[in-house]
Amino acid sequence: MAREECPGYEFFPELSEVYNDVFDWCIMHPKGKLDPVKGLWIEGSIGTGKSTLLRIVRRFCGMVRPMQQHRNGSAPMPYSFRITSALKVAAAYGKQGFAGLDDFIDNPCQAIDDLGCEPDTVSYYGASLNPLEFVMLGRYDVRHGDFTHVTTNLTAEEAMRRYGARVMDRCVEMFNFVTMQGPSCRE
């Protein structure tokens, strides 16, 4: 399944504990190390396969997780989530202001890829803000029954400096923190 998602993907033995923890989370293993009601915050060095792992998780969870009933009252559906780059979220604010961020906050299952690669502030008709900080705070407000996932090259400390203590304090409640360190897999 992993190679269907990414034909060149390789599992690295030094990351086997990370893989085991994440796939235990996927199947909601009662003795797993990660809390199955929290999302995944996958951090690590550049090129270690964080984004690819997230796509594999999305596919695998669609097969093994129970049907999800979301707060919007829709019919139960297979577990899945949309993956959006942090740059695209920031661009949405630049084009549409707060209205451009609503979909990223209200989507029942949302993943933000490459958190931290977006500009620190984005302006819309003179109103400047950090759109990802705004989205993360909004996702916190809808965290019960919804999932948020993140991939980032930032450490938790770097994310704290960038988004502030208020956001990171909420992230502790929202996420299981998983670290993927190693050399880049890219050629």
Name these PLM-found stretches.
Residues 56:
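Active-site signature of alpha/beta-hydrolase-fold catalytic machinery across serine-
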Residues 47-53:
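Conserved glycine(s) of the Walker
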Residues 59-62:
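Walker A/P-loop NTP-binding motif
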Residues 2-33:
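N-terminal pre-Walker A segment at the start of P-loop NTPase domains
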Residues 71-143:
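Conserved nucleotide-sensing/catalytic segment adjacent to the nucleotide-binding pocket
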